[in-house]
Amino acid sequence: MKPFLVDVPVLILFFNRPQQLSQVIEQVRNARPSKLFLYQDGPRSEHDLPGIKACREVTDQIDWDCEVHRMYQEKNYGCDPSEYISQKWAFSMVDKCIVLEDDDVPSVSFFTFCKEMLDKYEQDPRITMIAGFNNEEITPGVPYDYFFASTFSIWGWASWKRVIDQWDEHYTFLEDKFNMQQLEQLIKERKFRKDFIYMCHRHIENNKAYYETIFHASMLFNSGLAIVPTRNMINNLGATADSTHFAGSVHTLPKGYRRIFTMKRYEVEFPLKHPRYVIENVAYKKAVYRIMGWGHPWIKIGRSLEELFLNLRYGNFSIITKAIKNRINKWLKRDQHR
């Protein structure tokens, strides 16, 4: 059996999409990490069973010296709280870990990059996570291989147990009047998502631990920074008809969103060029907000109209109806938390 190449744990979350998962596993096999945590949600119905079985066959193809842990659920928990459950599980056994979902295809050097960052910044409380995805693809004018940002993507990331231990799965911060006022002011000052607090209220009402809002809240309250590679290291395969967060296909996404699913991924060269200071790259934050349309209502409106046109063009009337219903429900529920 071949020896491992990089001494770093990796958590892989998957469900019933063997085609996407096989691309992720192929890159993991090329990197050969020392430890794997495999998490699979359970079936919603018998129709999921063939895909679930096929995914397990993919993950059985581990042909190097690797410590493997598996958590295969018997029942279906859904994307949330499966994300939270799997991450707490992995970080309960290791102090640092890389996290990949079944549609996050990393460059091979991403694993060594994360290993070096996890070791270098392990004791630095300013650093919350290491991202693999760069929304700009290549951030111009940066003379280093990575920089620091207050905004980040969770499409392939790594962090430490010290960070995950700060997570508040019960959203108790919503009951803290003073610190909620501070959070509201911080969100306004940073021009962060206006619906973030609404999302937190909605998630606690659903009685589920949604790790994205839990993670972002922890990062905001603790003034955390993310490490972002200067050149993108992740491809996301999530814009498909069976994806969790997107409906239809990449062809019906507005052009501004489509590019983030079609951009290149790059390999980083070692030794890394390290930044001289730990300071936020504000220009990157502004660029990401513009790309995602956060704080740019006219960009949002334009993309909504573009998406409507594309779905009409492709005859996706059920998606249009669902989107309208979701938008109305969102407006109505948001009013309850004002």
Where does each model-flagged region fall?
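Peripheral/terminal regions associated with large enzymatic or DNA-binding modules
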Residues: 1-99, 104-338
